[in-house]
């Protein structure tokens, strides 16, 4: 039923807003001009103004065989090897955003290096996509859908360091953070209300108290 509704919406969108389909030979150019580096079949359908999935997949297969596009995951395609791996990580399972150790390490909260990309999503899973290991960490739906402390950069959703700090404590009761000096504690307590979790509130107050006592 959901698939039928999606196909109906796609046909409606195309017929209403995308009557001017690209001319033959311009299909690849349209993808290459897009700001996206990773495409789903649905993305391509909208860009091409094409509602027939068979036509889309056949055309994509032709470009892949010719070496003009790269298939990075089932149903996901990239312009070339220089695609944004974080964009890919958030396109495999949605909704999702980059967070946890990926953000904590980049922001100097944790010093340990991780090769995995850590992503908050609706399931726990570790996969490998085109050589990149990606760890998905399950979050409660109400938390996952709340965008407080989430920034969008080049089409990719990223947790702020304060959100990543709270997310990690939300799923891991005890955790060692190397450097809490970089956190904005006003933002931490602002985002904390998203979780509606008494255990987390007590834990954060404990970390804050210990932080203050060491200053």
Which stretches of residues belong to each language-model region?
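Nucleic-acid-binding surface
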Residues: 12, 78-215
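Intrinsically disordered, low-complexity and often Lys/Arg-enriched segments
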Residues: 1-18, 213-215
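Short beta-edge/loop segments at beta->alpha junctions of small alpha/beta modules
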Residues: 10-95
